[in-house]
């Protein structure tokens, strides 16, 4: 297995390396079967939207969560309570509750889909680091971020695999898109976290009116939380790309490209000409169910539907 390691640019003589800043990644790529992908406990999956944009999905098993984190436990409790309250509100037969749900849903659909991508990337402190055993390299040891930081220079980190469809995407394109995602995410979500927190005090007078729920306050609190989560996801993604201690390996996922081809084979020549000059929408209503089934990521259905809706509207505006 070929590892992606940090090497100072001056020491690189091989041509089969891809540079990202001061890091170098091997471009001697390995192919991965669908079964290997499905059994990978933690991975990054690149889901092309157009030939220029992709949805970056960080997926991991639940046993990789840092169960010792009090913050994570508290957050989980709050999220469960909030979700229960939201479900109750959605089921309410009262007309004003239905209007509130419709308004909030409309606002949520207007947030950039890149936010949903970053929300799949947990805070780095929430995930246990996987390292190789000192004597037995086939053994996997899991450490909290705090313990890993102390030992990082003396241990070998288990690789994080990045799966993509060959022919549609490539390692350099994946890196470009991930870099753009975290750079824009850090700026955008830091700014909107601040805006939401500044707006919260303005909703306090509504608390004094018992018959009217403080919907703006609840919404701004939720949006502040989401923006913080997305910001931390962007920070984690930056660490994965820039830290020499991280170990990224790119994998061509066998059969992945063919899934896209099956979904786009019905496109007519006229439609192709009509969209000339604009990025082709590779992720659409036909390819979506095929991708969800192939990758077994049905939990992303609402997120990817949001992507299709926003990108379709964007293309329609560009045609005018």
Swiss-Prot record:
It comes from the Eukaryota. It comes from Saccharomyces cerevisiae (strain ATCC 204508 / S288c). PANTHER family: K+-H+ EXCHANGE-LIKE PROTEIN (PTHR28062), TRANSMEMBRANE PROTEIN (PTHR28062:SF1). This is Uncharacterized protein YDL183C. GO terms for biological process: potassium ion transport; proton transmembrane transport. One of its GO terms (cellular component) is mitochondrial inner membrane. To S.pombe SpAC23H3.12c.
């Amino acid at each position: 297995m070929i590892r992606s390691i940090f090497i100072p640019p001056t020491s690189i003589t091989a041509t089969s390396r891809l540079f990202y800043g001061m890091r170098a990644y091997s471009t001697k790529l390995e192919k991965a079967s669908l079964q290997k992908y499905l059994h990978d406990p933690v991975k990054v999956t690149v889901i092309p939207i157009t030939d220029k944009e992709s949805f970056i999905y960080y997926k991991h098993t639940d046993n990789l969560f840092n169960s010792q984190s009090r913050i994570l436990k508290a957050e989980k409790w709050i999220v469960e309570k909030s979700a229960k309250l939201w479900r109750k509100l959605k089921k309410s037969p009262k007309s004003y509750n239905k209007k509130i749900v419709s308004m909030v849903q409309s606002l949520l659909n207007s947030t950039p889909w890149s936010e949903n991508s970053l929300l799949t990337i947990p805070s780095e402190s929430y995930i246990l680091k996987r390292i190789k055993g000192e004597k037995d390299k086939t053994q996997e040891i899991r450490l909290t971020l705090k313990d890993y930081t102390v030992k990082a220079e003396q241990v070998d980190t288990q690789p994080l695999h990045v799966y993509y469809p060959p022919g549609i995407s490539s390692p350099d394109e994946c890196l470009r898109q991930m870099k753009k995602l975290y750079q824009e995410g850090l700026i955008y979500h830091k700014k909107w976290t601040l805006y939401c927190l500044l707006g919260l005090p303005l909703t306090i007078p509504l608390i004094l009116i018992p018959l009217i729920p403080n919907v703006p306050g609840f919404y701004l609190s939720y949006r502040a939380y989401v923006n913080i989560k997305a910001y931390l996801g962007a920070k984690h993604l930056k660490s994965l790309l820039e830290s020499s201690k991280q170990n990224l390996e790119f994998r061509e996922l066998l059969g992945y490209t063919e899934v896209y081809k099956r979904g786009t084979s019905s496109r007519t020549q006229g439609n192709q000409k009509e969209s000339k000059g604009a990025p082709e929408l590779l992720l659409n209503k036909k390819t979506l169910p095929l991708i969800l089934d192939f990758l077994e990521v049905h939990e992303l259905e609402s997120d990817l539907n949001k992507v299709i809706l926003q990108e379709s509207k964007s293309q329609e505006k560009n045609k005018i």
